[in-house]
A protein has these predicted regions:
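N-terminal secretory signal peptides that target proteins for export/translocation
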Residues: 1-13
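A detector of low-complexity, intrinsically disordered, Ser/Thr/Gly/Pro/Ala-rich segments
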Residues: 10, 15-19, 259-260
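Bacterial N-terminal signal peptides
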Residues: 16-28
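Bacterial Sec-dependent N-terminal signal peptides
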Residues: 26-36
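Extracytoplasmic copper-binding redox domains, predominantly the cupredoxin/blue-copper superfamily
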Residues: 34-335
Length: 335
C-alpha cells in the first residue's frame, strides 16, 4: 500500500486519459479502414421520358477493405457488374453467369460479380479487399461503364464522399438537361415530307475519365398520327444504343423477333394492321454495333418499321421494352 500511495494522483489521472484515448483510437480504426462509400445507378426525368444510363459518378477512388453501396434510382433496369479481365460479356438475363442475390458481395478481380437487374429503390453493396483498377459495367446497356480504383491504405485518397455527391448531381443534371434538345432533331438525310413519320426514340452517348454515360429518350415523338385508310406510317429509331419496338396488339414474350412482318427492299420491316385485333410487332429496332478490329463486320441495323392501315379505326401501339416508362402512341385512321 505504501508503494501505491507514493504515486502522484496527477500521474494516475494522465495515465487514465492516455488509456482512454488509446481505446477510442482502436475502436475508431475499423471505421476508417473500412469506409462506406455511396453512389447511384441511373437517373430519370419526372415524366420517365428521359433516362440516364449512367453510374453517378462513374469513377471512384477507395481503399482496400472499403465498401461501396450503389443505390438504383430509375425505373429502367440496370445491373452493377464487375467481370474478370478478359471475360466474355454475357447477357443480362444470364449474369456472370449467376447473380449475387443477397444485396451484397465481394470482388477481388478473380471471380465475376453481378447484381440481377434492379430498379428504383433497390441497392447493392460490394466490398473490395484487393488493390487494383476494376471496370464497372451494366449488362443491360453497353455504353454504361465506370471504374473503381482500389488503393493501398498507405496511399491518400484524392476525394471524399461530398465530392462524389456533388459530381453525381452535376452529371445527372447534365445528362437529363433539356439543353440536349434531342426531341427536335430531324432525319435530314431521309426526307419523307409526303409520308407520316414518327421518331421512335433518340439518344446520345458521352464519355469522361471514368467511361461512358448515355441519355435515351423513351418516347415516340409526335406519337399520335391521323391518316386515311390505305396510308402507311413509318417509325425510325434514332437512338445509337437503345433498342425499341413498335407493337400493335398482344406483346410477345420475346420482343427481339418480329411478328407478322415482311421486309421491304431497303431492309425496313413492314406490317399490315387491318383491325384492332391484329398482332403486328416490329421486333427490336436499333443501329448496328460498331465495327471492331479482328471481328466480322456486322450487317446494317434494322432501324425502320412501316405499317399500312387499310381500314378506318383507332390503333394503339407501344414499345414492348419501354412501355412501362410511357413509350406509347396511337394511329387514327380516317375513311
Amino acid at each position: 500500500m505504501t508503494a501505491f500511495n507514493s504515486v502522484p494522483l496527477s500521474r494516475i489521472f494522465r495515465l487514465g486519459i492516455f488509456i482512454s484515448m488509446f481505446v477510442l483510437a482502436l475502436l475508431s480504426f475499423p471505421e476508417i479502414a473500412q469506409a462506406q462509400w455511396q453512389a447511384t445507378v441511373g437517373a430519370q426525368s419526372e415524366s420517365l421520358g428521359r433516362q440516364a444510363l449512367a453510374f453517378l459518378p462513374n469513377e471512384l477512388w477507395i481503399h482496400t477493405g472499403d465498401n461501396v453501396t450503389w443505390t438504383f434510382d430509375s425505373d429502367e433496369i440496370h445491373t452493377v457488374t464487375f467481370q474478370r479481365a478478359g471475360q466474355i460479356r454475357l447477357a443480362f438475363q444470364v449474369g456472370c453467369p449467376g447473380f449475387a442475390a443477397d444485396g451484397s458481395g465481394s470482388f477481388n478481380g478473380t471471380t465475376c460479380l453481378s447484381t440481377p437487374p434492379l430498379t428504383k429503390g433497390q441497392s447493392f453493396t460490394i466490398t473490395f479487399p484487393t488493390a487494383g483498377n476494376f471496370k464497372l459495367v451494366c449488362l443491360v446497356h453497353a455504353n454504361m461503364t465506370g471504374v473503381v480504383h482500389v488503393l493501398d491504405p498507405s496511399q491518400p485518397l484524392p476525394h471524399q464522399q461530398d465530392f462524389y455527391d456533388d459530381q453525381a448531381a452535376e452529371q445527372r443534371k447534365s445528362l437529363l438537361s433539356d439543353d440536349h434538345d434531342l426531341e427536335h432533331r430531324h432525319d435530314s438525310g431521309h426526307d419523307h415530307s409526303a409520308m407520316n413519320t414518327v421518331m421512335a426514340g433518340i439518344g446520345e452517348v458521352s464519355a469522361n475519365g471514368g467511361g461512358f454515360q448515355t441519355l435515351i429518350v423513351t418516347r415516340f415523338m409526335e406519337p399520335t398520327k391521323v391518316i386515311h385508310a390505305g396510308e402507311t406510317v413509318e417509325w425510325t429509331n434514332f437512338d445509337p444504343l437503345a433498342r425499341h419496338t413498335i407493337t400493335f396488339g398482344v406483346q410477345p414474350v420475346n420482343p427481339v423477333a418480329p411478328v407478322n412482318t415482311t421486309r421491304d427492299t431497303d431492309g425496313a420491316l413492314h406490317g399490315i394492321v387491318n383491325s384492332a385485333a391484329d398482332n403486328v410487332h416490329s421486333g427490336v429496332l436499333g443501329a448496328a454495333p460498331q465495327d471492331q478490329v479482328s471481328l466480322p463486320a456486322p450487317p446494317p441495323g434494322v432501324t425502320r418499321f412501316r405499317v399500312t392501315f387499310p381500314n378506318p379505326g383507332e390503333f394503339p401501339y407501344i414499345c414492348a421494352i419501354h412501355g412501362g416508362l410511357g413509350m406509347k402512341g396511337k394511329v387514327i385512321v380516317l375513311p
